[in-house]
Amino acid sequence: MSEKKNKKEKLAEEIEQEELNSLDESVETVEEEATEETLTEEQAKILELENKLDEVENRYLRMQADFENVKKRHIADRDASQKYRSQSLAQDLLPALDSFEKALATTSDQEEVKQILKGMEMVYNQILVAFEKEGIEVIPAVGEQFDPNFHQAVMQDSDENAGSNEITAELQKGYKLKDRVIRPSMVKVNQ
């Protein structure tokens, strides 16, 4: 009886061991499947996050480039503003300068008028010096070739002593501020 009992116990132990082994295998299989599913889900999440990161990095780089462009444009605008700051004042003073030139072109025998003209000439010269300090200069005209960038042709001439397209007379002086024309010269051009 004890042998039977031992056999039964051994058999029960073997069955129990087999069930445990079977359960272990099932658990391992389930764990492997779960791990594979988890890995696949995690890889998908990683891929999604990497794509989002790339997108954010690209947006950041574009924004940084835009910022640099705005910065450069601002510097260029500021430099141009500084360079041409006196343009508006010069444009406002040009009619007065023209009036000075017309007044100085008159002559008189009266001593008082000569003194006034001398004072006006001094003021006129001071304005020219101030213009020169700001980079404002007269556009050369008579004897030069006509250039539509600097001259405005208002009359034509037929002078045999002048070359073709040469300026023969200046009706109104032109001025430029550094490389920018403030007012073109009004000229008479030979055919």
UniProtKB/Swiss-Prot annotation:
UniProt-listed PROSITE patterns: GRPE (PS01071)
Comp. bias (Basic and acidic residues): 1-13
One example GO MF annotation: unfolded protein binding
Pfam families xref list: GrpE
Residue span of region Disordered: 1-40
Any GO BP: protein folding
CDD domains attached to this UniProt entry: GrpE
Predominant place of localization: cytoplasm
Keywords recorded for this protein, A-Z: Chaperone, Cytoplasm, Stress response
Cell compartment(s), UniProt: Cytoplasm
Cellular component terms per the entry's GO annotation: cytoplasm
Positions with biased composition (Acidic residues): 14-40
InterPro entries, per the entry: GrpE (IPR000740), GrpE_coiled_coil (IPR013805), GrpE_head (IPR009012)
Complex and partners: Homodimer.
Protein family per UniProt: Belongs to the GrpE family.
Biological role: Participates actively in the response to hyperosmotic and heat shock by preventing the aggregation of stress-denatured proteins, in association with DnaK and GrpE. It is the nucleotide exchange factor for DnaK and may function as a thermosensor. Unfolded proteins bind initially to DnaJ; upon interaction with the DnaJ-bound protein, DnaK hydrolyzes its bound ATP, resulting in the formation of a stable complex. GrpE releases ADP from DnaK; ATP binding to DnaK triggers the release of the substrate protein, thus completing the reaction cycle.
HAMAP family, sorted: GrpE
Protein name according to UniProt: Protein GrpE
Lineage, broadest ranks: Bacteria, Bacillati, Bacillota, Bacilli, Bacillales
Gene: grpE
